[in-house]
Amino acid sequence: VGFKAGVKDYKLTYYTPNYETKDTDILAAFRVSPQPGVPPEEAGAAVAAESSTGTWTTVWTDGLTSLDRYKGRCYHIEPVAGEENQFIAYVAYPLDLFEEGSVTNMFTSIVGNVFGFKALRALRLEDLRIPPAYVKTFQGPPHGIQVERDKLNKYGRPLLGCTIKPKLGLSAKNYGRAVYECLRGGLDFTKDDENVNSQPFMRWRDRLLFCAEAIYKAQAETGEIKGHYLNATAGTCEEMMKRAVFARELGVPIVMHDYLTGGFTANTTLAHYCRDNGLLLHIHRAMHAVIDRQKNHGIHFRVLAKALRMSGGDHIHAGTVVGKLEGERDITLGFVDLLRDDFIEKDRSRGIYFTQDWVSLPGVIPVASGGIHVWHMPALTEIFGDDSVLQFGGGTLGHPWGNAPGAVANRVALEACVQARNEGRDLAREGNEIIREASKWSPELAAACEVWKEIKFEFPAMDTL
């Protein structure tokens, strides 16, 4: 027999420190915590092996393939500063291991099996470099940032949204009324909550009809284009598509999907439909914290964000830096750039492990949402810039005078911040002053400032380097 069976060292085959990475390789950076007594090279090689061609023993069918052509390679390992027994293992995967245009297959290969591996205490996928050759097999976002601005005819400022609350329990008619008031008051978008699908108290078709009525009424009164993110997420792909088709028939501009709970296969299907039929696609990241919140195990959100840009979506929730949900500033801005820009340089201080070239794949607009209100407006405008959606749910509907005045307050605050920025003022330093000045001209804003002046969500961010 030409080989010996038995448990073998992975590092003999899969640890290749001299390997020169190819332009077509998919590169991964894993944070590896080996079990006591397992050397980091062996742990890194094990990850490379188990996520590509390897298995735990030599098999005779190895002789029927070219391992050198198909194997993943751990080509570099470095210790994590300030952490004991934690390493960053860099793995290169040949492009042929992946099906074209399938985020599902990419994840099944790279993170499908290795995370339960005994030789590791914990494993986290920190970043992926997607080569242009692979990027080009994806359609990506249905429209992208510039086309969205052209469709909506809104330029030079962030867009404003609002999630309709209470998220569950309203009837379709009352839900539509809340949508109308917010849009009429000056918001660009309102949003179905991620868990609004089609429940007994409000079936999807009724909701879509009343929301469409609200959109057209608000558009007629304001002369602005309005939208409501109609959540098409459903229990089956067929049902999801039925909802998207109905939205298109109503002529509304945008639908929505929960891409992690719905799954990448469903998401990519919907994104293709949206491009073919002129619908924008808003993406909510429900369930992301289950995957990305642990520092030493799971997948960092920047990887989930890259995957979404490939699968397709025009907006995605990306943290706020200032509200009630997770997000450290530099790291958040790192993956915000990965969503919006065409070319992003490697920058470890922002958690970006690889230079990423998207070769003209359309960009995704980041959405800041969760515990934000008018006092946050200067910070949000400065941090996220124009190409963003700022979403105030409670920060609109919690206004003491009602939804429409709440919307007015947010729009006035936003316009004041954009004007101040364009005049060259420093939003970080003068933000509170800018809001105070604007509230002299807007009783709605003054009332909002009064309600939320003391509210803070003071916890340290977990997403640190």
From Swiss-Prot:
Q: Where is this site: Transition state stabilizer?
A: 324
CC cofactor: Mg(2+)
- Residues that the record marks as modified (N6,N6,N6-trimethyllysine) are 4
Q: How is it modified after translation?
A: The disulfide bond which can form in the large chain dimeric partners within the hexadecamer appears to be associated with oxidative stress and protein turnover.
InterPro entries in alphabetical order? RuBisCO (IPR033966), RuBisCo_large_chain_AS (IPR020878), RuBisCO_lsu_C (IPR000685), RuBisCO_lsu_C_sf (IPR036376), RuBisCO_lsu_fd_N (IPR017443), RuBisCO_lsu_N_sf (IPR036422), RuBisCO_lsuI (IPR020888)
Q: Recorded GO terms, molecular function?
A: magnesium ion binding; monooxygenase activity; ribulose-bisphosphate carboxylase activity
Query: Does the record carry Iron as a key word?
Result: no
Instruction: Report whether Ubl conjugation shows up as a keyword of the record.
Output: no
N6-carboxylysine PTM positions read 191
What keywords are annotated for this sequence in UniProt? Calvin cycle, Carbon dioxide fixation, Chloroplast, Disulfide bond, Lyase, Magnesium, Metal-binding, Methylation, Monooxygenase, Oxidoreductase, Photorespiration, Photosynthesis, Plastid
Q: Which PROSITE patterns match?
A: RUBISCO_LARGE (PS00157)
Reaction(s) the record says it catalyses: 2 (2R)-3-phosphoglycerate + 2 H(+) = D-ribulose 1,5-bisphosphate + CO2 + H2O; D-ribulose 1,5-bisphosphate + O2 = 2-phosphoglycolate + (2R)-3-phosphoglycerate + 2 H(+)
Q: Where in the cell is it found?
A: Plastid, Chloroplast
Catalytic center residues: 165 (proton acceptor), 284 (proton acceptor)
Q: Name one GO biological process term.
A: photorespiration
EC number from the UniProt entry:
4.1.1.39
Q: Which residues bind substrate?
A: 113, 163, 167, 285, 317, 369
Cofactor note text: Binds 1 Mg(2+) ion per subunit.
The role this protein plays is: RuBisCO catalyzes two reactions: the carboxylation of D-ribulose 1,5-bisphosphate, the primary event in carbon dioxide fixation, as well as the oxidative fragmentation of the pentose substrate in the photorespiration process. Both reactions occur simultaneously and in competition at the same active site.
Q: What else is known?
A: The basic functional RuBisCO is composed of a large chain homodimer in a 'head-to-tail' conformation. In form I RuBisCO this homodimer is arranged in a barrel-like tetramer with the small subunits forming a tetrameric 'cap' on each end of the 'barrel'.
The entry describes its oligomerization and partners as: Heterohexadecamer of 8 large chains and 8 small chains; disulfide-linked. The disulfide link is formed within the large subunit homodimers.
The UniProt similarity line reads: Belongs to the RuBisCO large chain family. Type I subfamily.
Name of the protein in question = Ribulose bisphosphate carboxylase large chain
- Please tell me the species this chain comes from: Bauera rubioides (Dog rose)
